């Protein structure tokens, strides 16, 4: 994975952790979604983003998020190196296989 993408991923994870610690779960998910987009091509980073989404779901008692993240974690372990739905934010509220637009400020990192 490109160093710029890895650095941007690490920044998003750090911001998500800070938001989680502050109880700002909406902001936490925002940064986790961005980390997910950046980390999709790395099995470890992709799965870790889903793991953190799962943890936020547990913290919020959001059963839809919890149940949706389990198969996404498994799929990320199996398919990250083969195919990913580019731009997909990784949340349980969006279809797992849906290709989505990449945010403008991240697009240059992934091209």
PLM segments and residue spans:
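Inward-facing hydrophobic residues that define packing positions of alpha-helical scaffold repeats
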Residues: 20, 32-33, 39, 70
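Short coil/turn linker motifs that delimit alpha-helical repeat modules in TPR/alpha-solenoid proteins
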Residues: 4, 24, 41-42
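TPR/TPR-like (Sel1-like) alpha-helical repeat modules
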Residues: 54-79
């Amino acid at each position: 994975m490109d160093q710029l993408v890895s650095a941007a991923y690490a920044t998003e994870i750090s911001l998500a952790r800070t938001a989680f610690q502050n109880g700002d779960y909406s902001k936490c998910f925002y940064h986790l979604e961005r980390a997910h987009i950046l980390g999709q091509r790395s099995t470890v980073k992709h799965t870790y983003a889903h793991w953190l989404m799962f943890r936020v779901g547990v913290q919020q008692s959001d059963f839809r998020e919890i149940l949706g993240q389990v198969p996404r974690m498994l799929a990320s372990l199996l398919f990250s190196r083969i195919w990913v739905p580019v731009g997909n934010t990784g949340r349980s509220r969006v279809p797992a296989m849906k290709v989505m637009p990449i945010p403008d400020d991240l697009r240059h990192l992934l091209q």
